Amino acid sequence: MSNLFQNYTRADLEFIKAEGNYLFDTQGKKYLDFSTGIGVTNLGFHPQVQVALQKQAEQIWHTPNLYQNSLQEEVAAKLMAGKDYLAFFCNSGAEANEAAIKIARKATGKQEIITFQNSFHGRTFGSMSATGQDKIKVGFGDAVPHFHYAVFNDLNSVKALVTENTAAVMLELVQGESGVLPAEQDFVTALADYCQKNGLLLIIDEVQTGMGRTGKLYAFQHYGIEPDIFTLAKGLANGVPVGAMLAKKQFGSAFGPGSHGSTFGGNKLAMAASSAVLDIMTKAGFLEQAWENAHYLQEQLTSALQVADTVTQVRGLGYMIGIETTADLGQLVKATRDRGLIVLTAGTNVIRLLPPLTLTKDEIDQGIMILQEVFEQHN
């Protein structure tokens, strides 16, 4: 009998070792990882990150935020790359989004925030309330008020919700949990313009889309916008718990001493890993190669699955790919796992692929072959 709350549906499988883009179970079986721990180990199990962690662990891994932390300054500088942002570090995407919600309200003096139907921003009370999915709120009582949910990719539905008390609009550029649904370019451009002209802050939730996942460091770079606030987590430290909220420097006074904080946020172990990740991702040619390989994966996968009657669409952005299907998701996940490939689901009818950015062409071909076999079997 387990000593754990049963709030997860766990497969009867444990991974105890990893090398590069592969996981190994207790029996020594090898699996190609197209899930990256739900978009976390974006670099696979990378030796450079491992060395950074080992080196930092031998020195000091935590100090309180009552003292200077040069590693936080280093990571913040790398994240903003010369742009006029300030950074706050925490431990997760939910915490990062909580910080974004708080600073948006405090900086504007307004309370209402518009998010989107089928969005996902986290499971803490504020981030859960921001999420446009009722299923994750069942049984927890009244949500935090003043959140309103627009229709994704529909600017008119946003405008209809705006009042004199609206502080911000909060958006995922790809709705990952609901089925890998990319935002349309025209919508994002028009939304950013509308927010700017009407004094609304634009918050971009990059928890899943950030850190190279879409082929650029941040997904908003694909859309040619610069948000007032954006949030990061998942891939930032490649598996070490960390989150970050970045906001324009003009809002710095909203987070003065005592206004917000995190005991573990920005600890030296997480910052050492984050710094190593950023060094790898910003190395000349790295993200360009990842983008090229992701395009190859999506193109070849679309071609390979054309004969599968149960596949209705392959879509995504970079290495964030959804296979929409009428087949049973549970059976597909198990069948791919049995063949040595780990994948995810999203929404009610999508197989979600979040592979490491470090995939080789051979590994891509291997994954496509397994997926083709599985979908042919479940045709």
From Swiss-Prot:
Pfam families referenced in this protein's UniProt entry, alphabetically: Aminotran_3 (PF00202)
Enzyme Commission number, as recorded: 2.6.1.11
CDD domains documented for this protein: OAT_like
Positions contributing to N(2)-acetyl-L-ornithine binding: R123, S262
Molecular function in Gene Ontology: identical protein binding; N2-acetyl-L-ornithine:2-oxoglutarate 5-aminotransferase activity; pyridoxal phosphate binding
Cofactor names: pyridoxal 5'-phosphate
Family stated for the protein in its record: Belongs to the class-III pyridoxal-phosphate-dependent aminotransferase family. ArgD subfamily.
Description of how the protein assembles with itself and partners: Homodimer.
Protein name, per record: Acetylornithine aminotransferase
Organism: Streptococcus mutans serotype c (strain ATCC 700610 / UA159)
Lineage: Bacteria, Bacillati, Bacillota, Bacilli, Lactobacillales
